[in-house]
Amino acid sequence: MYTPANNHNRSLAMSTQPTPAAARHCKVAIIGTGFSGLGMAIRLRQEGEDDFLIFEKDAGVGGTWRVNNYPGCACDVQSHVYSFSFEANPEWTRMFARQPEIRAYLEKCWEKYRLQEKTLLNTEIGKLAWDERQSLWHLHDAQGNHYTANAVVSGMGGLSTPAYPRLDGLENFQGKVFHSQQWDHDYDLKGKRVAVIGTGASAIQFVPEIQPLVAALDLYQRTPPWILPKPDRAISETERRRFRRFPLVQKLWRGGLYSLLEGRVLGFTFAPQVMKLVQRLAIRHIHKQIKDPELRRKVTPDYTIGCKRILMSHNYYPALAAANSTVITEGIRAVTANGIVDGNGREREVDAIIFGTGFTANDPIPRGVVFGRDGRDLLDSWSKGPEAYKGTTTAGFPNLFFLMGPNTGLGHNSMVYMIESQIAYVLDALKLMKRRELLSLEVKAPVQERYNEYLQRKLDRSVWSVGGCKSWYLHPVSGRNCTLWPGFTWRFRALTRQFDASAYHLTTTPLAALSNEARQQAEGVPA
């Protein structure tokens, strides 16, 4: 795999550059231990590269499937496609795996490939800065430790930082407050009056779990989601035995599920009229599970299905229809010491407030964390929303790769497929760096710009843009869709199958050591 240039005839080769004595060096630094980070580490090891470190801010691995452990937490993509292609699991017990089983799967992968020795737990990278003189990334953790790396792979994704709405008076509330991603399992909800704020993917899973326990459940809904029945079921021991004995059967099953899911993209991007048929199914689901006309009205969206993420549940609507549940659509005026005042001025007393308000997906990395060439903050480059070339690299940030980066999200299939596509692209880039003794590679700004213009043209015609809703897919400042891939996943895989060196500035000498004219040429700026 990737080895820094070490030719004795070239005094500027990276391996001859001194690094601070306190810094621990690796060729590849991987941030995060979800599907992205672990997948990258496993593939590096399979390719024979062992000089890498994995940084994980939490006390264990699993990423979002470790920290999101609220009641009812589960995947909304079938288990056999929501897993690594190179690490099939014949032991899935349900069609849609629940959080403990997915976390256990990732932990098993971590252990099988002996990644414990490469993982630094409880190590949050607080600053990441590019050093032009040495062509290295400097990483600093919260404890003050210093690391350097030739390349950095970010596997943090966009679902790592909880989003909280701004509510007047929240600081005065005397009861319990927490976000679904930071569930307080020590707090007993039994017999409590609970307010749930938000109706996203997390809320529709935990609301049915807590509704039978609480004395009263007030659900504050700004925009209702479209919800389809969830075709979940247990996978029998007979089926699991068949998958164990005949791996090809499981492979064919996985392929069939993938193809079935892949076809759904037609309604999102190519033929939005198809969504009318899906919308009828969703309306039928509402009428089947809710008898009260007023509640039906409250939970029926006024936008085209697919504009916001389509959710799946078989027990959310019955939970809302229960006698102890109230759906409040008037908004929130303020939070008081003992409750919440709605938009009509009515105060409802509660013992606890639970946020089901999602994540900061459009600004996944805060300001002051990542600094590229010339000390540029990543958020300055992303002022109109996250932007990358093939969702993986960003101009001005050499040797930095994003997995689950901008415009790689899906509304129809498994993200693991996209992650594996990106991993293959990054591996090919690292191989090129070794083969050609490169110190750095950086996507050309015009190439990145043209690629994203192409994406936005496709997205402008999609249901996500014309469906009549305001969703977290769209950046709050620019209105651009910085989240989703507007097409078939196999098309993205074709684009990332091979690293396209012509789209990049490739350097064998640190830019800081070049003459001004040579530096401008390397950066693609006319002299």
From Swiss-Prot:
Record: residues binding NADP(+): A74, C75, D76, T199, G200, A201, S202, A203, I204, Q205, R222, T223, K308, R309
Residues that bind FAD: S36, E56, T64, W65, R66, V67, D76, Y82, I125, M415
Annotated GO MF terms: flavin adenine dinucleotide binding; N,N-dimethylaniline monooxygenase activity; NADP binding; oxidoreductase activity, acting on paired donors, with incorporation or reduction of molecular oxygen, NAD(P)H as one donor, and incorporation of one atom of oxygen
InterPro entries, A to Z: FAD-bind_Monooxygenase_sf, FAD/NAD-bd_sf, Flavin_mOase-like
Catalytic activity, EC: 1.14.13.-
Source domain of life: Bacteria
Site (Transition state stabilizer): R309
Keywords attached to this entry: FAD, Flavoprotein, Monooxygenase, NADP, Oxidoreductase
Required cofactor names: FAD
Family classification: Belongs to the FAD-binding monooxygenase family.
Functional description taken from the UniProt entry: Catalyzes a Baeyer-Villiger oxidation reaction, i.e. the insertion of an oxygen atom into a carbon-carbon bond adjacent to a carbonyl, which converts ketones to esters or lactones using NADPH and/or NADH as an electron donor. Thus, can convert bicyclo[3.2.0]hept-2-en-6-one into the oxidative lactone products 2-oxabicyclo[3.3.0]oct-6-en-3-one and 3-oxabicyclo[3.3.0]oct-6-en-2-one. Is also able to catalyze the sulfoxidation of methyl phenyl sulfide (thioanisole).
Name of the protein in its database record: Baeyer-Villiger monooxygenase
Species of the source: Pseudomonas aeruginosa (strain ATCC 15692 / DSM 22644 / CIP 104116 / JCM 14847 / LMG 12228 / 1C / PRS 101 / PAO1)
